[in-house]
Amino acid sequence: MDQSEIVKLNKIKAKSAWLKKGAARSSAISCGLGIGIGFGIALFIFSQTLRGFGIYLAGLCTFHMWEYIWVTMYHPDKLSSKSFLLNHSPQFNMALLISFIEFWIEWYFFPSLKTFSLWWVGAICMVFGQIVRSVAMDTAGSNFTHLVQEEKRDDHVLVTNGIYQYMRHPSYFGWFVWSVSTQVILMNPISIIGFGWASWSFFSQRIENEEDYLIQFFGKSYKDYKKSVWSGIPGIH
């Protein structure tokens, strides 16, 4: 079966999975995210005090939309409304809530803080992080999953080419940069520190857990790869 036939088959599987696994919910979420992207762009264009928030909102909605699109491309049989990663974890949801509260409190009481010109630095870094994560996911293809795999699939191979030559977990690196950058855009001084610490703690545990399984799956090949290539997260080998 050539590549075009595989893509066509995956499209059929994706459509079937979409119809079976919460088509209405997925449609509603997609619509909501699309509105969020449009509203964010409108704020950036027309608002003087909420331009940063507009970029943040558009970037946040784009992130979740892309996560869903990626699953339709490479894991159509696992497609569901959960593929948007909207309910990633209680910690992630709490961090988002705190960042929103911080932004609006500071916007109301210290409006000058939210018009500080460095928001564009965060925007550039956020786009960079999104691109790195997207490239990593595309390079890994079906070998990349949202959940840590505890059993090796027959088609699971060790990916060390492309961006994986330079870091073992480029998708985590991209997400780490992306998450901290969103708080730079919002000019949330407390959440910048909080997101950095929370993201590092999360990936520290996840990488250790994931690599235990990868060593079981690939043995010496992964051990050698681990020794020679950086993890992608500062302070984590």
UniProtKB/Swiss-Prot annotation:
UniProt GO cellular component terms: endoplasmic reticulum; endoplasmic reticulum membrane
Enzyme Commission identifier(s): 2.1.1.100
Keywords, sorted A to Z: Endoplasmic reticulum, Membrane, Methyltransferase, S-adenosyl-L-methionine, Transferase, Transmembrane, Transmembrane helix
Localization (cell): Endoplasmic reticulum membrane
Disrupted-gene phenotype: Cells lacking both icmt-1 and icmt-2 do not propagate cAMP waves in a sustained manner and fail to aggregate, affecting differentiation and development.
Entry-linked InterPro entries: ICMT_MeTrfase, PPMT_MeTrfase
The keyword Endoplasmic reticulum appears for this protein: yes
Binding site for substrate: R206
Binding locations of S-adenosyl-L-methionine: Q149, H156, V157, L158, V159, Y164, H169, P170, S171, Y172, E210
Chief localization: endoplasmic reticulum
Reaction it catalyzes: [protein]-C-terminal S-[(2E,6E)-farnesyl]-L-cysteine + S-adenosyl-L-methionine = [protein]-C-terminal S-[(2E,6E)-farnesyl]-L-cysteine methyl ester + S-adenosyl-L-homocysteine
Keyword Hydrolase: no
Pfam families, A to Z: ICMT
BP terms from Gene Ontology: establishment of cell polarity; methylation; nuclear envelope organization; protein localization to nucleus; regulation of aggregation involved in sorocarp development; regulation of G protein-coupled receptor signaling pathway
A molecular-function term among this protein's GO annotations: protein C-terminal S-isoprenylcysteine carboxyl O-methyltransferase activity
Superkingdom to which the source organism belongs: Eukaryota
Topology class, membrane: Multi-pass membrane protein
Function according to Swiss-Prot or TrEMBL: Methylates the C-terminal cysteine residues of small GTPases and the heterotrimeric G protein gamma subunit in response to cAMP. The methylation is required for intercellular signaling and regulation of cAMP waves propagation. It also seems to induce the activity of car1, a G protein-coupled receptor which senses extracellular cAMP during the aggregation phase of development.
Family: Belongs to the class VI-like SAM-binding methyltransferase superfamily. Isoprenylcysteine carboxyl methyltransferase family.
Name of the protein in question: Protein-S-isoprenylcysteine O-methyltransferase
Organism per entry: Dictyostelium discoideum
Lineage per the UniProt record: Eukaryota, Amoebozoa, Evosea, Eumycetozoa, Dictyostelia
